[in-house]
Amino acid sequence: MATINQLVRKPRKRKVAKSDVPALQACPQRRGVCTRVYTTTPKKPNSALRKVCRVRLTNGYEVSSYIGGEGHNLQEHSVVLIRGGRVKDLPGVRYHTVRGTLDTQGVQNRKQGRSKYGAKRPKS
């Protein structure tokens, strides 16, 4: 514990909060172009083929972004919108592609949780 005299001489330093999503530069989303679309395997104990794309953003950053939902239409040169949000079992993937915007189609035949996957309300 510092004495009052020590604190008068040299005040306490503020902790600087580090951003979880630096490539967004304090924006809610960013637009970018897919440079590579591929699948990758998660870390232990999970097992799957996770769909991921490498995206070159409008601000010059190049990041990996997860493509959520069943099936997608993305390929190289597709224009996508990305948001923050990491994938816990994929190291280095700290962004999600937003489904149903720009070149990314929404998930087909999605009945529940539609807003997260850009799916329209089905005709009853």
From Swiss-Prot:
Which PROSITE patterns is this protein grouped with?
RIBOSOMAL_S12 (PS00055)
Q: Name one GO biological process term.
A: translation
Q: Which UniProt keywords apply?
A: Methylation, Ribonucleoprotein, Ribosomal protein, RNA-binding, rRNA-binding, tRNA-binding
Among the entry's GO cellular component annotations, what is one? small ribosomal subunit
Under the heading Pfam families, the entry gives: Ribosom_S12_S23
Residues carrying 3-methylthioaspartic acid: D89
Q: Would you say which domain of life the source belongs to?
A: Bacteria
Q: Which residues cross the membrane?
A: none
Region (Disordered) residue spans: 1-22, 101-124
List the cysteine pairs that form cystine. Answer: none
- The UniProt regions of compositional bias labelled Basic residues, in chain numbering, are 111-124
Q: Which family does it belong to?
A: Belongs to the universal ribosomal protein uS12 family.
Role according to the record? With S4 and S5 plays an important role in translational accuracy. Interacts with and stabilizes bases of the 16S rRNA that are involved in tRNA selection in the A site and with the mRNA backbone. Located at the interface of the 30S and 50S subunits, it traverses the body of the 30S subunit contacting proteins on the other side and probably holding the rRNA structure together. The combined cluster of proteins S8, S12 and S17 appears to hold together the shoulder and platform of the 30S subunit.
Which NCBIfam families does this chain map to?
rpsL_bact
Q: What is this protein called?
A: Small ribosomal subunit protein uS12
* Species whose genome carries this gene: Marinobacter nauticus (strain ATCC 700491 / DSM 11845 / VT8) (Marinobacter aquaeolei)
